[in-house]
Amino acid sequence: MAKVISQDTFDDVVKENVVEFSMTPSEAKEETIKQFEAQGINLANIIKDLSVNPQTGQPVINETVDKIKEHIGQKLEETTELLEQLATLDAECKKSLAHRVLAGKNGAHDALITLLEETLSAESPNESVLKKSLEAINSLTHKQPDLFDAEAMAVVLKLLALKVESEEVTLLTLQWLQKACIMHEMNRQNIMNTSALKLMKPLLGKGKDRLVRELTAVFRFLVLDDDIRVEFGCAHEHARQIAGEVLITLVELLPAYQDPNVLADLLLTIGTLAVRQELCTAIDEAGGLKSVFEIMSSNLDEVRLNREALKLLRALAGQDSVKSHIVQQGVAPIIKQLLETHQSNENIVAAALACVTTLTLRVQEHSAAFFDTGIAEVIVEALRAHPKHKIVQRNGAWAIRNMVSRSRNQCETWISFGVEDLLNMAMKEHPSVEQDIKAALRDLGCSVHLREEWTGTAEKKIAA
């Protein structure tokens, strides 16, 4: 079994090489690695690329954390040195997860929290110190959500309630919350159990592009379900609670923005929060459908924006009356136009076909509305353009099946465009979606071999 050493032991030898033998940091590290490897020691657990102070031989990250701790409680008006130390810690933490773990072990998180608390307790908080501290704690918390604790949450609430001239402090606070949410269900639940949501709601408004994007990201991250350590998460309940506070506000913000990125984030967030039928109805009643159609029509060339719009429409169509309103208000020509404009983009094509699938499911009138736009030929051409893309072929088969299953009068038109050969080729190319394609061929009235997947064997023969 290979021998191992601690990071401190490795760092002490590097320091000795720098101080005692006047080596440069890079020479000292090389020599240390050779020494330990010659002794048969496994260095897999050691951070070998730590920045080292050439004067003291100490790792920069350790020295920086110690210097920040020294500043706490001194209440010095001169903050230049402190800001430099915070910038150094930020830069070191950005290098790798190993650097962040080491900083955390050396007490960087507690030091930054104490520094933030001390700064916030002042009569007029120093915004520069707040910004640099938040930048450092953002870098430190990245992929380390376990560091976020009750003290950190208390600081976040103070920061959200703080009236500052620059919105930079608020943006950094929201980014910190996002990092605390990723892959950590308990953090999400703890955040939802505080007044954070009520403090964030007033921040939503017109002309706040960056703020709206960061806020919507926090709302989405609060409804993640990505923590394998927790058997059951509260994603649905969180979505319901957040929707109750901000859903209508988000819908009302849609006409206020022109930036495609802001609009895409708003649409994505609305779709993420629309987890119940009554919420879908509320979005419809607030004029959400009209806004979405206007956004799609005036931004036909925007890939991400239209993909999110299609996903949102598909989510809203889960409520039958809203599904009817979507089709009645004229979505079919818009989706056809999108398919024509972005026929080479497999992501838009897949999203558009999935949307057609949902909107035409079990409703003959909806199928007719799409068919009358001439979308059949466009769908066939889209399938022809992406023969290797399994999701496009599967979604196309779904869309065709739903359109013709209650409208057999369409079959002849579909077949005249050569869809049968395309589907048969897709079935050979993508065996995993064979059943989906066979369902489309069956409802088109084409020849299809339906194989019996499983046959039982009876102990006694059943008479014919």
UniProtKB/Swiss-Prot annotation:
Q: Where are the ARM repeats?
A: 235-275, 287-331, 332-374, 375-418
Q: Which GO terms describe its biological process?
A: anatomical structure morphogenesis; hematopoietic progenitor cell differentiation
Q: Which InterPro entries would you find in this protein's record?
A: ARM-like, ARM-type_fold, Armadillo
Which Cys pairs does UniProt list as disulfide-bonded?
A: none
Q: Which residues are annotated as modified residue Phosphothreonine in the UniProt record? A: T9
Q: Which UniProt keywords apply?
A: Phosphoprotein, Repeat
Please report which protein family the annotation says this sequence is part of. Answer: Belongs to the ARMC6 family.
Name listed for the protein in its UniProt record: Armadillo repeat-containing protein 6 homolog
Q: Which organism is it from?
A: Drosophila melanogaster
Q: What does UniProt list as this organism's lineage?
A: Eukaryota, Metazoa, Ecdysozoa, Arthropoda, Hexapoda
